[in-house]
Amino acid sequence: YRRSSDLIGTLTFVDEKGRYGALGHGISDVDTGELLHISKGALYQAEILGIQKGKSGSPGELSGLIRYEPGQIIGAVDTNSKNGIYGSFYDRRAGIPVKKTEVAYKQELEVGPASILCCVDGSVKEYDAEITRIDMNHEDTNKSFVIHVTDPELLEITGGIVQGMSGSPILQKGKFAGAVTHVFV
C-alpha cells in the first residue's frame, strides 16, 4: 500500500473531450514492480531544473520541481494502466501547447524518419528521431517499435532519450505514432 507516488513524466495527448494520457507506461511499486492501484490523483505541471545526460550504462534523467499547490493542478488522475496514466485534463491555461494531430494506425508505421516532442529547456520542441525497428506482434504493446534520437541539439543536451521523457509523443509523417516508454542503457 502506498499513500502517494510522484515522478516526472510527459503529457502524451489530450483528446477533444478533455481526457489525457501521459507517461506511456504505468506507475509501479518500486519494491515489488507491481502496477499500483490508483484511487485518485492529481496531474501537476513540473519545471525541469536539470538534466543528467544519458550515456552507455547510465540512462540519464530529467530532474525537476513539482509544486504541490492547488493552483498548479492541471488534471486529475483516475487510471493507472500498463500503457500509462489517464484522466481529465482541465487546465489549458498551463501553457502546454495542445495541437490537433491525426493518429497513425500501427500498419502505417515504417522504419525511417520520425520525431519526438519533449520539453528539456522550458518549452516543448520537436526533435528529429528515427524508428529503427517495428514489431507489430510484440506481446508488450509498449515495445512495438524502437526509436533513436538523431537530432544533434537533443543529443547534445540529453545524450538521447532519458528518464523523465516517458510519455513524449512520437510523430511520423505528421501523425501521432506512439509515446516514449523505455530508455535503453
Question: What positions do the PLM features span?
Answer:
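Short beta-strands and strand-coil junctions in structured, solvent-facing domains, enriched
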Residues: L7-I8, S28-T32, L154-L155
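Catalytic nucleophile loop of clan PA
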Residues: T158-V180
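Charged, low-complexity helical/coil segments in non-catalytic cytosolic or luminal regions
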Residues: T12, G18-S144, V183-F184
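Short strand-coil-strand connectors
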Residues: C119-S123, T150, K173
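Terminal peptide-recognition signature
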Residues: Y1, L11, I170, G174
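Extracellular trypsin-like serine protease catalytic domains
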Residues: K143-P152
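Short, structured beta-strand/loop micro-motifs enriched in basic residues and often containing a Trp
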Residues: R93-K99, P152-G159
